[in-house]
Amino acid sequence: MRIVGAIFSIAVLAGHAHAEDDAAIEDVISSQLSAFNARDVDSAWQYASPMIQRLFGNPRNFGAMVENGYPMVWTNEVTQFLELTPLEGRQLQRVLIRDAGGVPHVLEYLMVETPDGWRIDGVSILPAPEVGA
């Protein structure tokens, strides 16, 4: 009976840790999206992974890339978190974002855990699903 209790306890703790990761990942993405809406690129930069920060060098370059390459992130209206999928020590978080014109976009955020918490390690715009038949 002790073994069953121990296994149950481990399962509960693992589920709790997973829920905390889910919430932390959503918080990082939401915070960065809010920072972009406020045009606070310095704050948005803090949610980028060390690899992304090395790639762009400074918040200004990073902000210009987002403004020009990800307009639905630069000015976003509504965010809905979809599935979260583990991937080789990282997490892929799909997010439905509506841009300023109300057009929906599905983005996939690659999340990496750092000593400072979860950070965004890349974003891909997924193709829109086909409608009709």
Regions found by a protein language model. Name each.
Residues E83-A133:
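Exposed beta-sheet edge and beta->alpha loop/turn motif
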Residues M1-S9:
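Sec-dependent signal peptide recognition
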Residues L13-A19:
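Sec/Tat signal peptide C-region and signal peptidase I cleavage site
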Residues I10, M51, P127:
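Residue-level detector of flexible, active-site-proximal loop/helix-junction positions
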Residues A23-D27, S31, V41-E88:
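Short solvent-exposed beta->alpha transition segments
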